[in-house]
Amino acid sequence: MTKALFFDIDGTLVSFETHRIPSSTIEALEAAHAKGLKIFIATGRPKAIINNLSELQDRNLIDGYITMNGAYCFVGEEVIYKSAIPQEEVKAMAAFCEKKGVPCIFVEEHNISVCQPNDMVKKIFYDFLHVNVIPTVSFEEATSKEVIQMTPFITEEEEKEIRPSIPTCEVGRWFPAFADI
């Protein structure tokens, strides 16, 4: 029987205060891995912005990833599961965000882009999460590709407004300024 441990990144493995993995956590994961336990990352982050696990990756402690809230899962270079958002729903979200004048992050299998970035994108993704700068693209360019996750910077009221146009999508919030879809 295979035994596995699953860990979130932000606030679980990586401290919100230090933006690092505590040495005691690294030692515990090394001990678990040495006993044959598999270690998986389970996160809302897309692969393109997992930039804070090098201390574990350098030690080959991570056996696989469940990213984008389960929409993209992989072990090494092998994709185990991928669930793209239907193109008509991606276009509906893009049109909604463009009309409202709010940013939206679009995540593909290997790339990430943002449309209409503002100070909130900078504050949350660059300053708080220490994500590298995300390329800015037009809504037309963002919707021309296969999208696995969208992060619109919309209120809960706006979420209710767009919800009928994205019926196959699951919506999650961990911060009031945006939703992971």
Each PLM stretch: what is its role?
Residues 1-4, 22, 181:
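Mg2+-dependent phosphoryl-transfer enzymes with acidic/Ser/Thr/Gly-rich catalytic loops
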Residues 1-7, 30, 34:
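Non-catalytic pre-domain segments flanking phosphatase-related domains
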Residues 3-18:
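Asp-based phosphoryl-transfer active-site loop
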Residues 6-7, 72-74, 141, 173-175:
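Short, basic/glycine-rich phosphate-binding loops at helix/coil junctions
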Residues 20, 48-49, 157:
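Short alpha-helical
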Residues 24-121:
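Active-site phosphate-binding/coordination module
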Residues 102-103, 107-181:
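Conserved acidic, metal-coordinating active-site core of Asp-based
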